[in-house]
Amino acid sequence: MGEPVTLVLGLGREVGNAVARTFQDEGHRILVADPLEERLESARDALEDGAATYHGELHSRLGLRNAITAALEAFGRIDNAVIIPEIEDGDQLLDFAQEKFEKALARSARGAALALRVIAERLLEQEDLPQAGVQRIPQKGTITFVLGYAAIASMPGRFTESVGQHAILGVMKAGALELAEHAIRVNAVIAIRPREERSESWTARRVPLGRAAKSDEIAEAVRYIASPQAAYLTGQSLVLDGGRSTLSGMLD
């Protein structure tokens, strides 16, 4: 079969389902993976028949290899991976728990680095799909991280989240340089996402467009980054912040 295969590693609250749907609508075969069965059940309801799932942790080499093996058993290959790390709970520098902090960094920085390595190893083992559609330089595969706004800007009460998201962004940039010679592109989508504790007034005063990014908007950005039309894009972050990073201060 000539359809590309996309892995979605981590579903988050809504974004993972939107990403999987968007790629499926583009004709991709899909495997979604998450440690929480209820999220996988939601994904099964959201996706068309034919999507595969993997239930297990995704922060170790073994867990990642198991997810890739599930994709290979279902579809025979992988072409794109979308990684959606967990958002850590709020805490502060002066009172964070050291053990919890260390585990969070292991999940973020180490988990991101392991994901790049394990996925890249598989991409390098397989033959490329025949080129179709728009003519671009062939790509071996793509890996895209979906990060929160804490990857580029911090705020009080979000210490561990900010450190972890910044660390993943560093892994993305360093990994993109390492894998460029192999035609594997690595990028990130950074978005202001809805949060349960954030009121509408927060975004109205701080975001020129007055709202957070929608899951479908994030998914479309990921789809573009993984497409042949973006074959010259690597090591970059596409920021969906409604103009927030351009604004000095707050709106009236």
How would you name each of these model-derived features?
Residues M1-L31:
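Canonical Rossmann dinucleotide-binding motif of NAD(H)/NADP(H)-dependent dehydrogenases/reductases
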Residues E121, L177-E178, A231:
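Alpha-helical segment proximal to the catalytic Tyr-Lys
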Residues T234-D252:
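Short C-terminal tail/terminal secondary-structure segment
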Residues Q92-L93, A97-L105, T203:
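Substrate-binding pocket helix/loop in short-chain dehydrogenase/reductase
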Residues V207-I218, Q229:
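A conserved structural motif in NAD(P)-dependent oxidoreductases
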Residues A180, R185, L233-G235:
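Short, small/polar-rich loop/turn modules that mediate ligand/substrate recognition or access, typified
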